[in-house]
UniProtKB/Swiss-Prot annotation:
A motif ('KMSKS' region) lies at residues 252-256. GO terms for biological process: glutamyl-tRNA aminoacylation. It is found in: Cytoplasm. Monomer. The keyword Protein biosynthesis applies. Pfam families: Anticodon_2, tRNA-synt_1c. One of its GO terms (molecular function) is zinc ion binding. It catalyses: tRNA(Glu) + L-glutamate + ATP = L-glutamyl-tRNA(Glu) + AMP + diphosphate. Catalyzes the attachment of glutamate to tRNA(Glu) in a two-step reaction: glutamate is first activated by ATP to form Glu-AMP and then transferred to the acceptor end of tRNA(Glu). InterPro entries: aa-tRNA-synth_I_cd-bd, aa-tRNA-synth_I_codon-bd_sub2, aa-tRNA-synth_I_CS, aa_tRNA-synth_I_cd-bd_sf, Glu-tRNA-ligase_bac/mito, Glu/Gln-tRNA-synth, Glu/Gln-tRNA-synth_Ib_cat-dom, GluQ/Sye. It comes from Staphylococcus haemolyticus (strain JCSC1435). This is Glutamate--tRNA ligase.
């Protein structure tokens, strides 16, 4: 593209970084970086009553964790600030006055009760609810009368009639709206704060935003924003609206959906890797060419093509996320995965709160056993249950294995050799099992399966010698003794 690409992610600090918002930020970031453009983070904080104390800092912290490095924001002013909407009143106020002076906006003194009554009557008549324009042409005398009654006005934009607003959406194609279906809408609330659709259009223009990429739920906001651009004689940015994210039942992803964790913070807490979430979220509504699904951030930037954004809803597949994270887990060194797993082991009282070096070394060996199968670091706790609790009651299949004819002989030989073994390490344990094989003539499944069942209570699991080392000599001998 010949012009400089500038995109923005504009969260509200009324909440934490949600999967849907993370996807919006991520697609904007990839689009900007692909075209060597600017990724701007702007804070839409005018809803002061709902703002969370740590909402803003949480947004930035989680964006940074995901690897989304912004070019401009509250900490990097490149001349387009302020980057908080609440600090941009000096920009909005003259423009509001200009619209009033040009009769493109007017003061409306209707009360909430009057507006609600109008809405109810329209619905009862089967009409689409919209403001009827009762205060669109007040006389000065009428305005003064309302002021004297103590009514505080909102300011409404005067919607042009019989006009079609059309834009070419980069995802959905051409979309049109009839202005006659849109009532005169509020641009400034009674408390003097500009509304979203007014402020966002002003901000995008003054910040030189070239492309607005956002969720499907913003399509209906676009004609109102186009009206603002038209009223000031400005060129509008290009728009792209991403498809919905749906759950596995194909229903819109809702914050009330208890089946799916909704916030990036929750995945961090469970021990997911940022690269894996970056990868997984990028594939929610966008697809690369070919079959490959695992890419680095740099590879995604290189191959990102907005033409491959999907019109169809993107399904949040939990199994797919587990698979993607597991692919990244396998590539990490054990120390990295152990550091992610350590808080979970401590929380479950499986490792002391202030672990010694010996505790940590044991923990690393435990993590190494399961690293290739872990979906996330916190999964180490349920996976390694056998190391910390009494053996579960054996199932029918396990009973059949442990009741084999050669098992007593096998266990007697193994017990004696392991009891004398020092140091109790995987390499020596492996040799010991081979010695037992030679001495007894028992081999293959008849050798390994009874040993595994005897010490773990399970038919399958990680490398047997390593498992025995991590279980520890005392626990292994105690469990073997039952079958000698």
């Amino acid at each position: 593209m010949s012009e400089r690409i500038r995109v923005r992610y504009a969260p509200s600090p009324t909440g934490y970084l949600h999967i849907g918002n993370a996807r919006t930020a991520l697609f904007n970031y990839l689009f900007a970086k692909h075209y060597d453009g600017d990724f701007v983070v702007r804070i839409e904080d005018t809803d002061s009553k709902r703002n969370l104390e740590d909402g803003e800092s949480s947004q930035f912290d989680n964006l940074k964790w995901l690897g989304l490095d912004w070019d401009e924001s509250i900490d990097k002013d490149k001349g387009y600030g302020p980057y908080r909407q609440s600090e941009r009143g000096d920009i909005y106020n003259p423009l509001i006055q200009q619209l009033l002076d040009e009769d493109k906006a007017y003061k409306c003194y209707m009360t909430e009760e009057e507006l609600e009554k109008e809405r109810e009557d329209q619905i009862a008549r089967g009409e689409m609810p919209r403001y009827g324009g009762q205060h669109a042409h007040l006389t000065e005398e009428e305005r003064q009368q309302f002021e004297a009654e103590g009514r505080r006005p909102s300011i409404r934009f005067r919607v042009p009639q019989d006009q079609t607003y059309t834009f070419n959406d980069m995802v959905k194609g051409e979309i049109s709206f009839d202005s006659n279906n849109i009532g005169d809408w509020v641009i400034v609330k009674k408390d003097g704060i500009p509304t979203y659709n007014f402020a966002v259009a002003i901000d995008d223009y003054y910040m030189g935003i070239s492309d607005v990429i956002r969720g499907d739920d913003h399509v209906s906001n676009t004609p109102k924003q186009l009206m603002i651009y038209e009223a000031f004689g400005w060129e509008a940015p290009r728009f792209g609206h991403m498809s919905l994210i749906v759950n596995e039942e194909r229903k819109k992803l809702s914050k009330r959906d208890g089946q799916i964790l909704q916030f990036i913070e929750q995945y961090r807490d469970l021990g997911y890797l940022p690269e894996a979430l970056f990868n997984f979220i990028t594939l929610l509504g966008w697809s690369p060419e070919g079959e490959e699904e695992i890419f680095s951030k740099e590879e995604f930037i290189k191959i990102f093509d907005e033409k491959r954004l999907s019109k169809s809803p993107a399904m949040f597949d939990r199994q797919k996320l587990a698979w993607v994270n597991n692919q990244y887990m396998k590539t990490k060194d054990t120390d990295t995965v152990f550091e992610l797993a350590l808080p979970h082991l401590i929380k479950a009282n499986l490792i002391p709160e202030s672990p010694s070096e010996d505790d940590k070394e044991w923990g690393r060996k435990l993590v190494a056993l399961y690293q290739k199968e872990m979906s996330y670091a916190g999964e180490i706790v349920p996976l390694s249950e056998m190391f910390f609790h009494e053996m579960p009651e054996l199932g029918e299949e396990e009973q059949e294995v442990i009741n084999g004819e050669q098992v007593p002989e096998l266990m007697t030989h193994l017990y004696g050799k392991l009891e004398a073994l020092e140091p109790f390490e995987a390499a020596d344990i492996k040799k010991t099992i081979k010695e037992v094989q030679k001495e007894t003539g028992i081999k293959g499944k008849q050798l390994f399966m009874p040993i595994r069942v005897a010490v773990t209570g399970q038919m399958h699991g990680p490398e047997l010698p390593n498992t025995i080392e991590v279980l520890g000599k005392d626990k292994v001998l105690s469990r073997l003794k039952k079958f000698v």
